[in-house]
Design a protein with these regions (language model features):
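Flexible glycine-rich active-site/ligand-binding loops centered on an Asp-His dyad
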Residues: 170
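Core catalytic region of metal-dependent phosphoesterases/phosphodiesterases
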Residues: 2-94
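Conserved beta-sheet core of the metallophosphoesterase superfamily
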Residues: 84, 95-167
Length: 170
């Protein structure tokens, strides 16, 4: 099974639509959302085509395919309009690996075995088994990014060019 991994959408319908096109491109069956879905937060400028209502409509259409965790910009009201749960953390099993999904604002407190996929800082980074896939809509390292998680690897791509940004063999 392949997963499309997105984080830090921050209400941008423009970049969400582009990212969702990658479901078919890569043959992904599920979507992993790593938080900060609708609101841009007080520290970020508005992303291009900021439209939380359109983001809600688009994502709710995929509610049966989504596993999502709550980010620091996600509020209780977001959970009322999204038709899928926002978990504090989630865990999936791939082959012999455990992969924990979290937003990342508490990643320093993580001390379990296995891999961690997170966002929050908007920067692609790998530190051991901690993997940050950047941001779909408000990158801090110049790449709008998404990732594809398979049974044996995670590959992060530039959303605009499909250039491989990083690949981690699990």
């Amino acid at each position: 099974m392949k997963f499309l991994v997105l984080t830090d959408i921050h209400g941008s319908i423009k970049y969400l639509k582009m990212a969702m096109e990658k479901l078919d491109v890569h043959g992904c069956e599920k979507i992993l959302l790593l938080g900060d879905i609708l609101y841009h937060g007080p520290r970020n400028d508005l992303p291009l085509e900021y439209s939380p209502k359109e983001v809600i409509t688009l994502l709710n259409g995929y509610k049966d395919k989504i596993i999502s965790v709550k980010g620091n910009c996600d509020a209780e009201v977001d959970e009322m309009v999204l038709e899928f749960p926002l978990f504090p953390e989630a865990t999936i099993k791939l082959n012999n690996h455990t992969v924990t999904l979290m937003h990342g604002h508490h990643v320093d407190e993580y001390n379990e075995d296995g891999y961690v996929l997170y966002g929050h800082t908007h920067v692609n980074k790998v530190e051991g088994k901690l993997i940050n896939i950047g941001s779909v809509s408000i990158p801090k390292d110049s790449h709008h990014t998404y990732a594809v998680l398979s049974q044996d690897s995670l590959t992060s791509y530039d959303l605009l060019t499909d250039e491989v940004i990083m690949k981690v063999v699990l």
